[in-house]
Amino acid sequence: MAIHLYKTSTSSTRNGAVQVKSNPRNNLISGQRRCGKGRNARGIITARHRGGGHKRLYRKIDFRRNEKDIYGKIVTIEYDPNRNAYICLIHYGDGEKRYILHPRGAIIGDTIVSGTEVPIKMGNALPLTDMPLGTAIHNIEITLGRGGQLARAAGAVAKLIAKEGKSATLKLPSGEVRLISKNCSATVGQVGNVGVNQKRLGRAGSKRWLGKRPVVRGVVMNPVDHPHGGGEGRAPIGRKSPTTPWGYPALGRRSRKRNKYSDNFIIRRRSK
């Protein structure tokens, strides 16, 4: 996959880049119907700032990495419209072809493998019990056999900091420190496309292609629309602390459900 840099001909293409991407494999894609785009069955907005967007094909990603002890080769590195990380197509020795998340630094032609006693190499997947302390990992399982569920976004990386008994201690990208079964698998390395949060879209239309609608500040609304609204001119919000459009405290209040079963596995809550 090549990266094409735009010339500075217009303000919307300044500092812009686009991926010259290949067509995905037909047996690894499926159509998807984006239900509602933020609306419920009656057409009422239930999730704000969503709607529109370009039509997408879903790429089937192998989060389980259950092709054990079979070496695979990275054939392509492709753009995926359903996530901010790149994906890469793997051709395994037994003829199987699958998509996985692109590890940072992996190039076309590299070989990867998953199993119990495989080298600690970028892109390889193995159980946490076989990894040394301090290993950088991503695509981490929470439940054995369910597939990776943690650290899957672009640039995400977790760290294995301890192993004791049947559990391993991980430091997640959010700063949370929690316990996971040592038998769960993870992939060595960091997810690629690290600088995605520094990408300049250049114009509002590029944001609309992603299915994101404009965000309006509550302080410029009317009182009927938002608790911050109303007043003459540039008036303050008129409250001790900011609130959501429905009057609940915002910016700092804990929103996690109390007494969840997973509280027993969290050693230190995430940092703000």
From Swiss-Prot:
Segments traversing the membrane: none
SMART domains cross-referenced by the UniProt entry: Ribosomal_L2 (SM01383), Ribosomal_L2_C (SM01382)
MF-aspect GO terms: RNA binding; rRNA binding; structural constituent of ribosome; transferase activity
Primary localization class, coarse: plastid
Cystine connections: none
Region listing for Disordered, in residue ranges: 1-33, 220-272
UniProt-listed Gene3D superfamilies: 2.30.30.30, Nucleic acid-binding proteins, Ribosomal protein L2, domain 3
GO cellular component, one term: mitochondrial large ribosomal subunit
Compartments it resides in: Plastid, Chloroplast
InterPro entries linked: NA-bd_OB-fold, Rib_uL2_dom2, Ribosomal_uL2, Ribosomal_uL2_bac/org-type, Ribosomal_uL2_C, Ribosomal_uL2_CS, Ribosomal_uL2_dom3, Ribosomal_uL2_RNA-bd_dom
Protein's GO biological process: mitochondrial translation
Amino acid composition bias (Polar residues), ranges on this chain: 7-30
Superkingdom per UniProt: Eukaryota
UniProt keyword annotations, A-Z: Chloroplast, Methylation, Plastid, Ribonucleoprotein, Ribosomal protein
Positions bearing N-methylalanine: 2
PANTHER family: LARGE RIBOSOMAL SUBUNIT PROTEIN UL2M, RIBOSOMAL PROTEIN L2
Oligomeric form and interacting partners: Component of the chloroplast large ribosomal subunit (LSU). Mature 70S chloroplast ribosomes of higher plants consist of a small (30S) and a large (50S) subunit. The 30S small subunit contains 1 molecule of ribosomal RNA (16S rRNA) and 24 different proteins. The 50S large subunit contains 3 rRNA molecules (23S, 5S and 4.5S rRNA) and 33 different proteins.
Its biological purpose: Component of the chloroplast ribosome (chloro-ribosome), a dedicated translation machinery responsible for the synthesis of chloroplast genome-encoded proteins, including proteins of the transcription and translation machinery and components of the photosynthetic apparatus.
Entry similarity comment: Belongs to the universal ribosomal protein uL2 family.
Name of protein: Large ribosomal subunit protein uL2cz/uL2cy
UniProt source species: Spinacia oleracea (Spinach)
